Amino acid sequence: MTEKKKLFVLCVALFCFMAVSAQQRMSVSSPDGKLRFSLKVTSESVSYDIDYRKQPLITNSLLGFSFDSGEFGRNLKAGKVQRKKIDETYKLIVGKTSSVRSRCNEMTVPMQEPSDSGRLINLVVRAFDDGIAFRYEFPEQKAWDSYVMYDERTQFNLQGNPMALLMYLPGYVNTHEGVYSHVRYDKVARKRLIEMPATFEFDNGVAVAITEAAIRDYAGMYLMKEKGGLTGKLSPKLGQEKIKVEIDNFPHRTPWRVISVADRVGGLLETNILTSLNEPCRIEDTSWIKPCRTTFTWWNGNVVPDSTFSP
């Protein structure tokens, strides 16, 4: 090999090494090892993949935000990853079972802008045997203690062409009622709001449902198919078009973004992942809560004194 060829090979190897070293990769798997969430942080973007039984379900899906203080999602550096195992049991007041065992592996990834005064957001990921969930945490920090959010850019780029069961909505202000469509993923209409949960069944029988949990002090999320796949769309504040969320002080947490996974569609009904992610019941004494019949004022008129509902 000539000196020029040696130099060329060395330069190519060095370039490849620099490209790989510029990427930060980390992952977390479910207790049974079947589900895996993989995160990739580069100078250009933050993205994730989800594999089930070593087969890709969701790939190259971008994460990020648009704030009044600027975009968050580029030129980030991942800090030291914190991991823990969660294994707890809790009682359900209502539901499919009286007692639930919740097991998952958790990974927390600090993501910060380069400067010492750069904004910091933690990505918290939980891998259950029956799903993946992730949320963002805004810890207390000197240079940033509030925000006005214009958008949360969370993508769900499904692989293949599964059957989709979903409901289109006319707008952010709606009754959450309508006719469901059962179509192939490539036939899902673009630029139309989609209610959550949205369900997808792959040809091998694996089923996925995309939804959210633990919504507090935050906008509700819908889905919309755009170029590259599904993107989360936050409902604007009342009377606003641009502003989605305003937070006056930290710490703060977003809702969980939940991808429930099962070997068959029926398995999605059997999961308790949403109650495991929601906050515990705040009612100390629940003995008075019993099965009963109820009625709703928006069906039968203003039967409640001083009600603001109209028949």
Enumerate the predicted regions with their spans.
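Bacterial Sec-dependent N-terminal signal peptides
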Residues: M1-R25
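Intrinsically disordered, low-complexity regulatory segments enriched
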Residues: C11, V261, V303-V304
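N-terminal accessory beta-strand-rich subdomains and adjacent acidic, glycine-rich linkers
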Residues: R25-I283
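Structural motif
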Residues: R257, R293-T294
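Phosphate/adenylate-binding glycine loop and adjacent helical scaffold
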Residues: K290
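Substrate-binding cleft of carbohydrate-active enzyme catalytic domains
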Residues: T294-P311
